[in-house]
Regions:
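Charged, compositionally biased interaction regions
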Residues: 1-12, 82-369, 373-391, 398-401, ...
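Short beta-strand "wing" residues that participate in macromolecule-binding interfaces
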Residues: 404
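Short, well-ordered strand-loop elements centered on a beta-strand within folded domains, enriched
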Residues: 33-39, 51, 162-165, 178, ...
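Internal mixed beta-strand/loop scaffold within catalytic domains of large alpha/beta enzymes
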Residues: 2-78
Length: 423
């Protein structure tokens, strides 16, 4: 075995050494079966690497159990696989569930596996390169890193177990694939977290319209979720989403908000949120060690974090009409020909007082039957110039006959439609 024969690159200038970053790792536990994930390996010698498992996950549990039994943990590392297998491996499945079963569901057929020759664990049959290895029962005792992380930041020095590579096999003219941080990794993480959040909200009985694992949240910590809301769903959605994986901050909005438009999301927060009512903070939740905002923790201790949810949906008890969107006058009906060589380009007819008075009575007759917005009045009497309609409406106001209904439509002062002054 000579790992130096592989073109394992450096990703950033402060990396601790060449890193295997895109290996799909399969491990076998005698009780829980197969677990699959993506972990990085810093090359230390021609047949020795580290394995970065500082975060609490199923692979870490497998390694810990093997350490307690003072036995090596057999693993395979499949490099150069289909993206579907990378997606599946990145999913944080329940203990005892093999992530390759999830990949098979995405693919629509079972993922093809093959048996290793030197360890009792399978590997991905379509891989370009396969490493057969063991995680030695040394514990988290060896320095490893640093490494440019998915956070867009340089990580610190980690303490990790040691991996001994026992065999290397590859295809003829094999292609070595390296996952570069943060962008490739970021886009691979987003779909798995999207699916996990959607499932959690489905279990909570919340109807989801869409989910955006935001790029600014490195598609890992931040989610913006639009829902078809029923009473109480905003808070229920927050609680469900914050329970997923390492999600840290969640914004829930109504289904009229585009979760992929940051201006709309910010607008929803600005116009629909009262901080004392709509912001939820959960302290001492399990955190991820790579979060640079966390205080340093002792070696081997999993950090805790604060999770924040913002319910930016329209609250129960708030009148829906407060959120009626602006519709611009004539935006859908205006034509350039109305203004160039058309009616608006001609000299306006000077309406006499007699014409204005007659028009005012016609408008009053209509408003006696039904309230109308000003633009509807102007449209109904479009044979008159707009200015004439405005003057006729003004005349009704001068005569103290004009009023408005609760929606702001024009009506007659003494009609059943007229708004009443609040007490």
């Amino acid at each position: 075995v000579d790992l130096y024969k592989l073109p394992i690159p450096m990703s950033s200038i402060y990396d601790g050494g060449p890193m295997i970053t895109a290996g799909v790792v399969m491990a076998r536990d005698p009780e829980y079966g197969i677990n699959t994930g993506i972990y990085r390996f810093m090359v230390k010698e021609k047949n020795l690497t580290g394995i970065d498992i500082v975060t609490t996950n199923n692979m870490r549990l497998f390694v810990q159990r093997a350490l307690e039994a003072n036995k090596p943990l057999p693993i395979s590392i499949s490099i150069g696989t289909h993206p579907i297998e990378l997606l599946g491996a990145g999913f944080k499945a329940p203990l005892g569930t093999d992530e390759m079963a999830i990949a098979g569901g995405i693919r629509g057929r079972a993922v093809q596996l093959a048996a290793c020759e030197t360890v009792d664990v399978p590997y991905l049959a379509d891989a370009e390169i396969v490493l057969e290895a063991e995680v030695l029962p040394t514990g988290w005792t060896q320095p490893e890193g640093r490494f440019g992380e998915f956070t867009w930041l340089m990580g610190g020095l980690h303490w990790n177990p040691v991996v001994r590579v026992k065999a290397v096999s590859m295809r003829r003219d094999a292609v070595y694939y390296s996952l570069h941080m943060p962008w490739e990794n970021t886009w691979l993480m987003a779909p798995t977290r999207y699916a996990a959040i959607r499932q959690a909200l489905r279990t909570a009985g919340v109807v989801v319209k869409d989910i955006n694992m935001t790029m600014g949240g490195v598609t890992f910590w931040h989610a913006v979720i639009s829902i078809k809301k029923q009473a109480g769903d905003g808070k229920n959605a927050l609680l469900a989403a914050l329970s997923v994986m390492d999600i840290k901050h969640v914004v829930v909005v109504d289904d009229d908000i585009d979760v992929f438009n940051p201006v709309e999301v910010e607008w929803a927060i600005a116009t629909r949120v009262q901080g004392d009512r709509d912001i939820l903070i959960v302290s001492n939740a399990r955190g991820k060690p790579l979060d640079p905002s966390l205080a340093p923790t002792p070696h081997g201790i999993v950090p805790t974090t604060a999770k924040v949810g913002i319910d930016a949906t329209i609250s129960e008890g708030i009148p829906k009409e407060r959120y009626e969107r602006i519709t611009y006058a004539y935006a859908d009906t205006a034509r350039i020909t109305d203004y160039i060589g058309g009616k608006a380009d001609r000299e306006a007819r000077k309406a006499s007082d007699e014409v204005i008075g007659k028009l005012a009575e016609e408008i009053a007759a209509v408003l006696e039957k039904t309230p109308l917005y000003f633009t509807d009045v102007a449209e109904r009497f479009s044979d008159y110039e707009f200015n004439a309609v405005a003057r006729a409406v003004g005349l009704l106001h001068e005569q103290e006959r004009l009023w408005q209904d609760p929606k702001g439509c024009l009506c007659l002062r003494n009609s059943v439609f007229a708004a009443k002054l609040p007490n």
